[in-house]
């Protein structure tokens, strides 16, 4: 992905990519012109270009070096789809999520019937504990400080 200024043309970006990758890139897609979260080069708008390519590591290193030199390319991001976890992952669609409640109701009787739960009886310890509620109060003591008047030189 390449981030360029709002006035930079698509042909400029494609010619730069052709000079580095020598027609190895599959496609260079211009994404929409967007407003940035913060200013880059005193502007709040930029263009994104998404580039898919297959090339060697030395060409990627050369691209990074030249994009740092070129003033028209503001930012760049290189992602290796083969080694990056989760980017080429094929998701399983046959997996069931959730429950089928119709099957569960048929096991408990007629459809739509539910059993009432019996109230749980409290043990003796639980019932005694709930009866005994002690109030907690924090004792506060006040200290009185008596200060002595300072002696002056005249009194000595």
From Swiss-Prot:
Function in brief: Binds together with bS18 to 16S ribosomal RNA.
Record family assignment: Belongs to the bacterial ribosomal protein bS6 family.
Biased composition (Basic and acidic residues): 113-135
BP terms from Gene Ontology: translation
UniProt protein name: Small ribosomal subunit protein bS6
Coiled coil: none
Region spans: Disordered: 98-156
Keywords: Ribonucleoprotein, Ribosomal protein, RNA-binding, rRNA-binding
Bias-annotated ranges (Low complexity): 137-147
GO terms, molecular function: rRNA binding; structural constituent of ribosome
GO (cellular component) term, any one: ribosome
């Amino acid at each position: 992905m390449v981030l360029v200024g709002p006035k930079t043309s698509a042909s400029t970006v494609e010619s730069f990519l052709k000079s580095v990758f020598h027609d190895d890139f599959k496609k260079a897609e211009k994404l929409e012109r967007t407003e940035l979260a913060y200013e880059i080069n005193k502007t709040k708008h930029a263009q994104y270009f998404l580039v898919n390519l297959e090339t060697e590591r030395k060409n990627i290193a050369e691209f990074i070096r030249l994009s740092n030199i070129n003033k028209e390319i503001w930012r760049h991001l290189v992602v290796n789809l083969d080694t990056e976890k989760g980017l080429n992952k094929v998701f399983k669609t046959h997996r069931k999520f959730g429950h089928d409640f119709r099957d569960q109701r048929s096991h408990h009787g007629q459809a739509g019937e539910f059993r009432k739960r019996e109230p749980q009886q409290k043990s003796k310890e639980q019932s005694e504990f709930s009866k005994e509620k002690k109030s907690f109060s924090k004792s506060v003591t006040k200290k009185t400080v008596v200060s002595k008047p300072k002696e002056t030189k005249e009194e000595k």
